[in-house]
């Protein structure tokens, strides 16, 4: 191809590209020199010159204006208004603080003050015949956490040959129930669930005398001291000893054991148990040492009238004074072994709302009965987890008697237990509030729990086998505490009353209760 031809081709390519540089909307007569995308704007010089340029006042001009009488008066007025407003707010805050009611100082509370304790006296009966002791218990910690219990009283589970003091080792786990490693693993797992482990160290639990024979007291005392120190080092949160009424010099030994636990940590608990229901004997044991928790058979007396229940509770509180109480119907055993079935729901409500620590045995949340089923051990029935729990007999187990069945029933005894345990652990009036019994109709036991400016709780228990309408009186309340005309329902032990839903407002002038029904009502603090 010639040189001229090459030049012509280049010109063609340039001519083809040139239209791309033209404006898309250019008119036919547009100047050829304009470029695509470039817009030139010509601003008239006279229009720019017409604009006013503001440069502000000079320093001298500002000082002159600011010093004028008008601006001086304005500044002083604004300054005076600011300080008057500030002083007014300060005075208002002082008045509010002075006139506001003083808050009561919260008492020091340990973990056992904040909820219920749950006893598992027979570990194998609790986990079932096919599970293995301590390892089986670990699998049920999730269930125990749903009960909102603060402590688990376990055992005894130590090595004990019946009536043989030298063959009893309080520092070793019974091999039939597990190993030391199993127990340490249980402690760690329970800690993650915020459940404290209390170990029952009643020495001769398989024998006739829980404390062996009187001449062997010194041997037992030495073993106890060694065991307490050893288990505390392993992380146990407390100890229980039962039948202290059968222990010679019980007051001396209890004081010594309490010192060992408290010297290790103030957050360690010692529980004593007695089969006695005599109030004076109970007080004598309590006076042996401070901060001792005592379970007894005091409430196992026939208290199946409201008047008798009120008398027993008030006598106990007066006798124990400012001591922290615990409430149970026995040192061991099920509620159903002491309380007729129709009173079980009432007693749950009673124990959870009295001032002190409620103590229950495994199965109390279900209404488990010691002799209800063929094949059940009389003193330690198997925990009924499901219909097949009682595998040692062919007799069927009713679903509504099991954990599985009651879990699914909003009106079950288990549901009531969980609700009460939850309230007991988070409401200040129930945690550490004052207790005042009320004047009420015959057959009723009613009382108020209150703390400072927190929500108040009214408990009304009908121990009669007939329904009644009652007026709850406030004549026994101290100054500054009064009852409203109505209160809101939190819980009724009668799950058949569908018309009484939580939050229903009930008149205290004419309060209707069914036979054996208990009510937990709530009303606010009013200054």
From Swiss-Prot:
Disordered: region residues: 1-31
Keyword Phosphoprotein part of the UniProt annotation: yes
Assigned GO CC terms: amino acid transport complex; anchoring junction; apical plasma membrane; apical pole of neuron; basal plasma membrane; basolateral plasma membrane; cell surface; lysosomal membrane
Extracellular compartment segments: 99-527
Major place of residence: membrane
Cytoplasmic compartment spans: 1-75
Protein localization: Apical cell membrane; Cell membrane; Cell junction; Lysosome membrane
Single Gene Ontology BP annotation: tyrosine transport
Domain of life from the UniProt record: Eukaryota
Tissue expression as described in the entry: In brain expressed on capillary endothelia in cerebral cortex (at protein level). Highest expression in kidney, jejunum, ileum, colon, placenta, testis and spleen. Lower levels found in liver, lung and brain with weakest expression in heart. Expressed in retina, inner blood-retinal barrier of retina, retinal vascular endothelial cells. Also expressed in C6 glioma cells and in the retinal capillary endothelial cell line TR-iBRB2.
Gene Ontology molecular function: aromatic amino acid transmembrane transporter activity; double-stranded RNA binding; exogenous protein binding; L-alanine transmembrane transporter activity; L-leucine transmembrane transporter activity; neutral L-amino acid transmembrane transporter activity; protein heterodimerization activity; protein homodimerization activity
Induction cue: Expression induced in normal hepatic cells in the presence of actinomycin-D.
Positions carrying Phosphothreonine: 5
Membrane-spanning ranges: 76-98
Location of Phosphoserine modifications: 2, 58, 300, 421
Crosslinked residue numbers (Glycyl lysine isopeptide (Lys-Gly) (interchain with G-Cter in ubiquitin)): 42
Annotated Basic and acidic residues bias: 7-21
Residues in cross-link Glycyl lysine isopeptide (Lys-Gly) (interchain with G-Cter in SUMO2): 59
Function: Acts as a chaperone that facilitates biogenesis and trafficking of functional transporters heterodimers to the plasma membrane. Forms heterodimer with SLC7 family transporters (SLC7A5, SLC7A6, SLC7A7, SLC7A8, SLC7A10 and SLC7A11), a group of amino-acid antiporters. Heterodimers function as amino acids exchangers, the specificity of the substrate depending on the SLC7A subunit. Heterodimers formed by SLC3A2/SLC7A6 or SLC3A2/SLC7A7 mediate the uptake of dibasic amino acids.
Name of this protein: Amino acid transporter heavy chain SLC3A2
Organism, scientific name: Rattus norvegicus (Rat)
């Amino acid at each position: 191809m010639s040189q001229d031809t090459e030049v012509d081709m280049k010109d063609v390519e340039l001519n083809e590209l040139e239209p791309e540089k033209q404006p898309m909307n250019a008119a036919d007569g547009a100047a050829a020199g304009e470029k695509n995308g470039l817009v030139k704007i010509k601003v008239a010089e006279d229009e720019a010159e017409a604009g006013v340029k503001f440069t502000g006042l000079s320093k001298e001009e500002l000082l002159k204006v600011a010093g004028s009488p008008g601006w001086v008066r304005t500044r002083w007025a604004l300054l005076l208004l600011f300080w008057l407003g500030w002083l007014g707010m300060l005075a208002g805050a002082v008045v509010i603080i002075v006139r506001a009611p003083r808050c009561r100082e919260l008492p020091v509370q340990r973990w056992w003050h904040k909820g219920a304790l749950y006893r598992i006296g027979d570990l194998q009966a609790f986990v079932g015949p096919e599970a293995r002791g301590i390892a089986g218990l670990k699998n049920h910690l999730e269930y125990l956490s749903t009960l909102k219990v603060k402590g688990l009283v376990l055992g005894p589970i130590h090595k004990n040959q019946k009536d043989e003091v030298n063959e009893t080792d309080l520092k070793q786990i019974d091999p039939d129930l597990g190993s030391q490693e199993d127990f340490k693993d249980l402690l760690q797992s329970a800690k993650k669930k915020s459940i404290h482990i209390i170990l029952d160290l009643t020495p001769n639990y398989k024998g006739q005398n829980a404390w062996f024979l009187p001449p062997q007291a010194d041997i037992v005392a030495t073993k106890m001291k060694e065991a307490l120190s050893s288990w505390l080092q392993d992380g146990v949160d407390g100890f229980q000893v039962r039948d202290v009424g059968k222990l010679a010099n019980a007051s001396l030994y209890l004081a010594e054991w309490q010192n060992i636990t408290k010297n290790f940590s103030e957050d360690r608990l010692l529980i004593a148990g007695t089969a006695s229901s005599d109030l004076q004997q109970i007080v004598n044991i309590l006076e042996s040492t401070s901060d001792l928790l005592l379970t007894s058979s005091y409430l196992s007396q026939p208290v199946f009238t409201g008047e008798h229940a009120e008398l027993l509770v008030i006598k106990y509180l007066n006798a124990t004074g400012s001591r922290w109480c615990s409430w149970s119907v026995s040192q061991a055993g099920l509620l159903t072994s002491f309380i007729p079935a129709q009173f079980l729901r009432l007693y749950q409500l009673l124990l959870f709302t009295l001032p002190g620590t409620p103590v229950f045995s495994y199965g109390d949340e279900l209404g488990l009965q010691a002799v209800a089923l063929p094949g059940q051990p009389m003193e330690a029935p198997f925990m009924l987890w499901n219909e097949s729990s009682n595998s040692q007999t062919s007799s069927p187990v009713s679903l509504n008697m099991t954990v599985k069945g009651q879990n699914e029933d909003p009106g079950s005894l288990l549901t009531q237990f969980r609700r009460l345990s939850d309230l007991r652990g988070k409401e200040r009036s129930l945690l550490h509030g004052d207790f005042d019994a009320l004047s009420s109709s015959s057959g009723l036991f009613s009382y108020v729990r209150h703390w400072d400016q927190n929500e108040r709780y009214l408990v009304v228990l009908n121990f009669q086998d007939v329904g009644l309408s009652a007026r709850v009186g406030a004549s026994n309340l101290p100054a500054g505490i009064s009852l409203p005309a109505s209160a809101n329902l939190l819980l009724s032990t009668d799950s058949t009353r569908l018309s009484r839903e939580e939050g229903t407002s009930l008149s205290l002038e004419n309060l209707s209760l069914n036979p054996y029904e208990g009510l937990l009502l709530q009303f606010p603090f009013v200054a």
